[in-house]
Amino acid sequence: MASTPSLIGLTYAGLAVLYLLVLPLLSLLYVDKRWTSGSAWEKVLMFFLVLFFFPGMVLLAPFMTFRPKPRSL
């Protein structure tokens, strides 16, 4: 059985991955999907998510592309 310090370390590592990678990725995908069609309160929620998960957004931003989809002519 693992000792208490290693369990504490694993817990901190799991929370760090959750805060720095998983939740910012989910919120970036949500913002990308709903930015043009969201209501005013939904945009307030989006701004809060970006502010709250800013360190993770800075880590993920170089790998994300939010270019507009090509239009059909």
Swiss-Prot record:
Keywords attached to this entry: Membrane, NAD, NADP, Plastoquinone, Quinone, Thylakoid, Translocase, Transmembrane, Transmembrane helix, Transport
Membrane topology: Multi-pass membrane protein
Enzyme class: translocase
Catalytic activity: a plastoquinone + NADH + (n+1) H(+)(in) = a plastoquinol + NAD(+) + n H(+)(out); a plastoquinone + NADPH + (n+1) H(+)(in) = a plastoquinol + NADP(+) + n H(+)(out)
Gene Ontology molecular-function annotations: oxidoreductase activity, acting on NAD(P)H, quinone or similar compound as acceptor; quinone binding
GO terms under cellular component: plasma membrane-derived thylakoid membrane
InterPro entries: NADH-quinone_OxRdatse_su_L
Transmembrane segments annotated in the record for this chain: 6-26, 44-64
EC number: 7.1.1.-
Annotated localization: Cellular thylakoid membrane
Predominant location category: membrane
Function: NDH-1 shuttles electrons from an unknown electron donor, via FMN and iron-sulfur (Fe-S) centers, to quinones in the respiratory and/or the photosynthetic chain. The immediate electron acceptor for the enzyme in this species is believed to be plastoquinone. Couples the redox reaction to proton translocation, and thus conserves the redox energy in a proton gradient. Cyanobacterial NDH-1 also plays a role in inorganic carbon-concentration.
Oligomeric and partner information: NDH-1 can be composed of about 15 different subunits; different subcomplexes with different compositions have been identified which probably have different functions.
Family: Belongs to the complex I NdhL subunit family.
Classification via PANTHER family: NAD(P)H-QUINONE OXIDOREDUCTASE SUBUNIT L, CHLOROPLASTIC (PTHR36727:SF2)
Name of the protein described by the UniProt record: NAD(P)H-quinone oxidoreductase subunit L
Species assigned in the record: Synechococcus sp. (strain JA-2-3B'a(2-13))
